[in-house]
Amino acid sequence: MIVKSLEDIQGTEDHQKGETWESRRFVLNKDNVGFSLNDTIIKAGTESYFWYKNHIEAVYCIEGEGEVEKKDTGEVWQLKPGTMYLLNDNDKHYLRAKTQMRMVCVFNPALVGTETHDEDGVYPLLAE
């Protein structure tokens, strides 16, 4: 059994920060369970472009409001607590936070923990 608190992660290499987000990574590749689990903050008033071409991501909003836009079609969905979206086709997308949002994110394959987005909004596929 693995038990971690947010305090265990903050300030470690499992706590990554970008310009518009910060990600606290609870479950990682080294845990050998086939997925990773992140507690992610999206800063209020920001827009981020992401493309997880190497990962499938499920995102569940637990705080705040915003929207996600599928880049290829322009479709927009509103996000609020209780809303989930799944990037099951490695969808290129924009994430816009009206207020600070807190999201629970599951990635497959699992993240190593040190990933940050490259110039294309992509997490590289890292090996430990």
Curated annotation (Swiss-Prot):
Gene3D superfamilies: Jelly Rolls (2.60.120.10). It comes from Oceanobacillus iheyensis (strain DSM 14371 / CIP 107618 / JCM 11309 / KCTC 3954 / HTE831). The keyword Lyase applies. Belongs to the ectoine synthase family. It holds the Pfam family Ectoine_synth. It catalyses: (2S)-4-acetamido-2-aminobutanoate = L-ectoine + H2O. Keywords: Lyase. This is L-ectoine synthase. It is an enzyme of class 4 (lyase). One of its GO terms (molecular function) is ectoine synthase activity. Pathway: Amine and polyamine biosynthesis; ectoine biosynthesis; L-ectoine from L-aspartate 4-semialdehyde: step 3/3. Its EC number is 4.2.1.108. Catalyzes the circularization of gamma-N-acetyl-alpha,gamma-diaminobutyric acid (ADABA) to ectoine (1,4,5,6-tetrahydro-2-methyl-4-pyrimidine carboxylic acid), which is an excellent osmoprotectant. InterPro entries: Ectoine_synth (IPR010462), RmlC-like_jellyroll (IPR014710), RmlC_Cupin_sf (IPR011051). GO terms for biological process: ectoine biosynthetic process.
